[in-house]
Amino acid sequence: MSLIMFGRTLGEESVRYFERLKRRRDERFGTLESPTPCSTRQGSLGNATQIPFLNFAIDVTRRHQAVIPGIGTLHNCCEYIPLFSATARRAMFGAFLSSTGYNCTPNVVLKPWRYSVNANVSPELKKAVSSVQFYEYSPEEAAPHRNAYSGVMNTFRAFSLSDSFCQLSTFTQRFSYLVETSFESIEECGSHGKRAKVDVPIYGRYKGTLELFQKMILMHTTHFISSVLLGDHADRVDCFLRTVFNTPSVSDSVLEHFKQKSTVFLVPRRHGKTWFLVPLIALVMATFRGIKVGYTAHIRKATEPVFEGIKSRLEQWFGANYVDHVKGESITFSFTDGSYSTAVFASSHNTNGIRGQDFNLLFVDEANFIRPDAVQTIVGFLNQTNCKIIFVSSTNTGKASTSFLYNLRGSSDQLLNVVTYVCDDHMPRVLAHSDVTACSCYVLNKPVFITMDGAMRRTADLFMADSFVQEIVGGRKQNSGGVGFDRPLFTKTARERFILYRPSTVANCAILSSVLYVYVDPAFTSNTRASGTGVAIVGRYKSDWIIFGLEHFFLRALTGTSSSEIGRCVTQCLGHILALHPNTFTNVHVSIEGNSSQDSAVAISLAIAQQFAVLEKGNVLSSAPVLLFYHSIPPGCSVAYPFFLLQKQKTPAVDYFVKRFNSGNIIASQELVSLTVKLGVDPVEYLCKQLDNLTEVIKGGMGNLDTKTYTGKGTTGTMSDDLMVALIMSVYIGSSCIPDSVFMPIK
């Protein structure tokens, strides 16, 4: 008995002695990596974290040092070099991708991830790097670096062995093998199939592919689930998923876009939207324990095939013993540890099925056709912290009542994902020519299982006009007047320069031209929400056009003195400009638009001439220039009248103005005069709001000829463009396009 007690005491003393020796060594030389093999549950996943400490010296102060898992202590700038960080992530996470991960259900054999670290390094570079000799720290110098490295790797090891990460890595590997088997099986012995046209032989090639929008849906789903499961390890999860999806150059801001709580996908018809959601939902349920998925569509008949598809997939992969269901309403998948995941199905006609639920993912299929009251129920899930809503719908925009998702296109690019096969630069050509079906730059490619040619397009449009663009290509709705496409005209750089750069004309009168050009676009209305009178006064500043005055005038009431009031507005603005620039201008060329009313245009011209004469007689101006008016001869008449008829000059006038504006040749004076724009509003910014509404519409003409027009009324057709029209026409008339001989004084 005493021998047994002596042996036990000796053993305990020996253990304590060796522990003291180990602590002394660790304090002197740093912590050594544990050679203990991984447990069965860890599998090869744990081996990925058993990367030994590399003893190499760096000449960097401690404040600029950073410990990178799997490598060691380096300068912290290395973390921000895309090439280095991507390679480091590959070297670290390649072992995780080749492991079997957390096997939560039996009878599932996952195919190893094929990866080689040497694939990223050329043989020549590898040979050159191998010949480099690195200076090593002494044991005492290496101790703090070894301890820091061990601490980082221990944290990384705890992350890699967590149940949540095991589920995430298992999901990515299973989905990878789904693609390998064309979405038929997640087992190594699964049957082969290929989603392709039936008349195209596959020649033994069974590997499937993902469309870009399908990969985007997968990334949105995976990133959001990982942020919910592994919120404390968000940085490491992002690195892992960058490696999984092969997106090393994706920035952190873009990754946040994948984690947002709602996203919208507008995809053309027959492209595999619902077809892709079935295996995605099934695999999410079979991998993530406790997850709750919701699926809703516009009618019950649309939810039933999805319900049956998910149920059959789960039973095919894992057996019927793990799957329980309530016909057409819910599916429950059970795990071996007693946990389970659920999926709930409902149509927009019965939203009570999703009320009161606690979803992590809510898929809204054919969302453009969801009933309005159901939309309110769905949007209510945005208030849930751990729920993401994914709207998926076709690009049907034929009816305003079924296009509420497409109306989001101007609100946020991060929210809306529109799938199309024609880029914005080439969309006008596709819309103008009836045989074009794809983008001529080949940047956007159509799937192999889509038949898209000129004959198909003409056939589709024979059944219903514009059906090709709206239903098949996923483009924009055509204008009622013909084939059309609108796009902004002014560049962002030119617009910012126009707002910020305003030279002083008062201090630089010597370089100003001696001629002022005035254009008046009259409007006889007292409704401030309708069109008003636009007045623009411009001149030359060296080779540039400079704006001296802008007026947007609305009548207080419709009376017999309306023409006189408009004339007074123009005269007052002109008088202020002449007072600010004494002895500078010798001629003023005035153009009064007479398209709406020639009599009123003549009356405005007379009012301006009379009121300007009053200023001259009152000695208000130090020197009065000569006032000349544009004169037109109406058809069938031999007398010239002081008004300007705007006919086909508008398109070339806008072309000239846009070219000069984007070249920086249209500027505003620092002493710009505006008596009608509110004091709290900058007249230049007020003008820019109207310039932003100017769009070009390209229409298909006879044969292959395109015609273009311009509109400044905005998408609703109700925006004001009076000030913009006055400015554009004043610049155009002041150019050499119109001779000075048409300007004459009023006699």
UniProtKB/Swiss-Prot annotation:
Its EC number is 3.1.-.-. It is an enzyme of class 3 (hydrolase). GO terms for cellular component: host cell nucleus. Keywords: DNA-binding, Host nucleus, Hydrolase, Viral genome packaging, Viral release from host cell. One of its GO terms (molecular function) is DNA binding. A motif (Walker B motif) lies at residues 361-366. A motif (Walker A motif) lies at residues 267-274. It is found in: Host nucleus. Pfam families: DNA_pack_C, DNA_pack_N. The keyword Nucleotide-binding does not apply. GO terms for biological process: chromosome organization. The keyword Signal does not apply. A motif (Nuclear localization signal) lies at residues 194-198. The active site is at E366, D521, E593, D722. Belongs to the herpesviridae TRM3 protein family. Component of the molecular motor that translocates viral genomic DNA in empty capsid during DNA packaging. Forms a tripartite terminase complex together with TRM1 and TRM2 in the host cytoplasm. Once the complex reaches the host nucleus, it interacts with the capsid portal vertex. This portal forms a ring in which genomic DNA is translocated into the capsid. TRM3 carries an RNase H-like nuclease activity that plays an important role for the cleavage of concatemeric viral DNA into unit length genomes. Interacts with the terminase subunits TRM1 and TRM2. Interacts with portal protein. This is Tripartite terminase subunit 3. It comes from Varicella-zoster virus (strain Dumas) (HHV-3). The gene is TRM3.
